[in-house]
């Protein structure tokens, strides 16, 4: 009782002092009095009184911004020293209420929200944690450090992926420009001029830009895996592979390079896939995993690949991927790999044949005629090649795929020939007309 009375009298004395300083607009004095009140409540372990005093002081008429900021920052130091989760949540919510709508404590509010979301996640309330995080738009915070902003947005993306909200995860991920990870951190930062906003330094627990780069691409791999976007997964692994810390450690770059090779094999044939495939084959480190170099060479070489022999050779490596960094290649990966080999073989056949029977095509692809027709039709629809099927005679006619320049040149040449022909015809008509006119006069 004696201690309680003593605490009340000390707080009353400090409240009077705080009022005098506040009315006199004495920033240092107001800040000191307010923080001293919070300190007394904390030392007495009276958490309820602490919450009350934080709210009361923040609502005082004409309360100075600096005093509110100091109170919030000081009270945040007490969060980890609370006795139980309920008390911790209550204190965080109190500080969040004080910080709401105040631009000068927006960074503190973001950090408090992150703490609360972490507690909710530990309690198994992932949806609630995700909703809390999405309430804060850190990309608009000018004073927040770049790395802290990125870390916050990545946490938002991760929580969305954890609750299978892939649409929102994509929207949030677009707030981060991948080029930001390639910024030169060795350059000296310009000192801000007087009057400019000072950017706060990121807390010690925020990872470096290169660590954030890896986290970002690992999250993007999770997102792209949902729709089996193999070429985008491959590009994400390529970005991880280019991180210096990964390239220097064989235990890290070998599994990543293996993943790049597998996803190149799984990706549909297009200019992006061809470019990445050739760039990977030029990598000297690929020779340290010869089986995968052979796999990529087989895909690049315009020769028919026997699926059975390829699968027997790489089946163990394929299934072993689930024990590597990044986990398995996906549920449909085995089927998609077979499909890519069939597509590769059809492209090879279209290069060497202008006409071929269905029966012969099916033999080369080791498929039935119905399956061969189905895969060929899908490739024609996707414009991977040009072919015409004569079903009654069972013959396929392949045509060379022309690029836009060739088509334009061909059209211009044909138009020139047509105009020449029209001009010659005009000359002939004119000549005949002149001859007949002379004959009539005679």
Swiss-Prot record:
Q: What is its main location?
A: cytoplasm
Q: Which InterPro entries match?
A: PCI_dom (IPR000717), PSMD12-CSN4-like_N (IPR054559), PSMD12/CSN4 (IPR040134), RPN5_C (IPR040896), WH-like_DNA-bd_sf (IPR036388), WH_DNA-bd_sf (IPR036390)
Which tissues does it occur in? Ubiquitous with highest expression in flowers.
State the superkingdom.
Eukaryota
Coiled-coil ranges per UniProt: 1-129
Q: Which Gene3D superfamilies match?
A: Winged helix-like DNA-binding domain superfamily/Winged helix DNA-binding domain (1.10.10.10)
> Which purpose does this protein serve, as stated in its record?
Acts as a regulatory subunit of the 26 proteasome which is involved in the ATP-dependent degradation of ubiquitinated proteins. Acts redundantly with RPN5A.
What is the protein name given in its UniProt record?
A: 26S proteasome non-ATPase regulatory subunit 12 homolog B
Tell me what organism the protein belongs to: Arabidopsis thaliana
**Coding gene?**
RPN5B
């Amino acid at each position: 009782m004696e201690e309680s009375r003593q605490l009340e009298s000390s707080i009353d004395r400090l409240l009077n002092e705080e009022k005098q300083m506040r009315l006199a607009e004495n920033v240092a004095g107001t800040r000191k009095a307010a923080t001293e009140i919070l300190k007394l409540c904390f030392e007495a372990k009276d958490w309820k009184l602490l919450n009350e005093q934080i709210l009361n002081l923040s609502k005082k008429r004409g309360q100075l911004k600096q005093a509110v900021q100091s109170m919030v920052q000081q009270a945040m130091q007490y969060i980890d020293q609370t006795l139980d989760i309920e008390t911790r949540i209550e204190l965080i919510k109190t500080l969040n209420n004080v910080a709401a709508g105040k631009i000068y404590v927006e960074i503190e509010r973001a950090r408090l929200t992150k703490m609360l979301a972490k507690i909710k996640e530990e309690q198994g309330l992932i949806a609630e944690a995700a909703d809390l995080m999405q309430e804060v738009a850190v990309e608009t915070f000018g004073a927040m450090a770049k790395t802290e902003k990125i870390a916050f947005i990545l946490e938002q993306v991760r929580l969305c992926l954890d609750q299978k909200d892939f649409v929102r995860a994509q929207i949030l991920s677009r707030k981060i420009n991948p080029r930001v990870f390639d910024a030169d951190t060795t350059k000296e930062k310009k000192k801000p001029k007087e009057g400019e906003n000072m950017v706060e330094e990121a807390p010690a627990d925020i990872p470096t830009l290169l660590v954030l780069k890896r986290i970002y691409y690992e999250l993007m791999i999770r997102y792209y895996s949902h729709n089996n976007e193999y070429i985008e997964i491959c590009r994400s692994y390529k970005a991880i592979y280019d991180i210096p810390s990964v390239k220097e450690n064989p235990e890290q770059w070998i599994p990543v390079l293996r993943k790049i090779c597998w996803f190149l094999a799984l990706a549909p044939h297009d200019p992006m896939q061809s470019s990445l495939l050739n760039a990977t084959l030029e990598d000297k480190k690929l020779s340290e995993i010869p089986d995968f170099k052979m796999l990529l060479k087989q895909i690049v070489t315009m020769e028919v690949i026997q699926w059975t022999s390829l699968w027997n050779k790489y089946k163990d490596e394929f299934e072993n991927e689930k024990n590597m960094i990044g986990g398995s290649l996906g549920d449909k990966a085995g089927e998609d790999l077979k499909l890519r080999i069939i597509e590769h073989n059809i492209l090879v056949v279209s290069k060497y044949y202008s006409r071929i029977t269905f029966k012969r095509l099916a033999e080369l692809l080791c498929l039935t005629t119905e399956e061969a027709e189905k895969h060929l039709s899908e490739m024609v629809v996707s414009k991977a090649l040009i072919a015409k099927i004569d079903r009654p005679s069972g013959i396929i006619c392949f045509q060379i795929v022309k690029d836009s320049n060739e088509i334009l040149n061909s059209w211009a040449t044909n138009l020139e020939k047509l105009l020449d022909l029209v001009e010659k015809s005009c000359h002939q008509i004119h000549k005949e007309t002149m001859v007949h006119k002379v004959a009539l006069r005679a």
